[in-house]
Amino acid sequence: MNPILINKLQRKLGYTFTHSELLQQALTHRSASSKHNERLEFLGDSILSYVIANALYHRFPRVDEGDMSRMRATLVRGNTLAEMAREFDLGECLRLGPGELKSGGFRRESILADTVEALIGGVFLDSDIQTVEKLILDWYQTRLDEISPGDKQKDPKTRLQEYLQGRHLPLPSYLVVQVRGEAHDQEFTIHCQVSGMAEPVVGVGSSRRKAEQAAAEQALIKLGLE
């Protein structure tokens, strides 16, 4: 690992690892090594969900479970995590195999999002739950301040469907146009055709569902609803 880039990353994260091997593992995609980050990602995903749920519970004492679930989903979804990864310049620190490097894996949203979760898992193992909770809340401060309950927290497919139904327009159609990668690490490309749009919008994700959500979000942006 390039020590200059790693030090820069740790400054942006706001955390310096005591055990550098945890940081290295968190940054390692399965295409690069058998000692990859998927177990850390599993751990980090659960920790992130808990921290954000706890924060929302205390910030919104009068909001019901449904709205809190939708707000949490917005905050922990893949494109939000990928945005954070780009803010950290995480792509330049990833350890990828030759195939992933060639295909631009350092830019792929699913890899960036998974690595953020792996970093959370790594920080927890390197420190404790109090430290990682404070760090996550620091990362999310602006997003937590800006989020609010309401229809905007519904997932993009639901919002797009409700928008079209409200105008008596046909429902959108979703078509898988490409599946890349091996079974354990696939990337789906979806075309979403919306009535009134000359061309389909495109969504990419690590599952068909995530790719459809990404395509629906692009449709909402084109409709001026995002």
UniProtKB/Swiss-Prot annotation:
Pfam family, one: Ribonucleas_3_3
Sequence ranges assigned to domain DRBM in this UniProt record: 155-225
Superkingdom, natural source: Bacteria
Name of this protein: Ribonuclease 3
Species this protein is from: Pantoea ananatis (strain LMG 20103)
GO MF annotations, alphabetized: double-stranded RNA binding; metal ion binding; ribonuclease III activity; rRNA binding
Active site positions: D45, E117
Cellular component, GO annotation: cytoplasm
Domain RNase III: 6-128
Keywords, comma-separated and alphabetical: Cytoplasm, Endonuclease, Hydrolase, Magnesium, Metal-binding, mRNA processing, Nuclease, RNA-binding, rRNA processing, rRNA-binding, tRNA processing
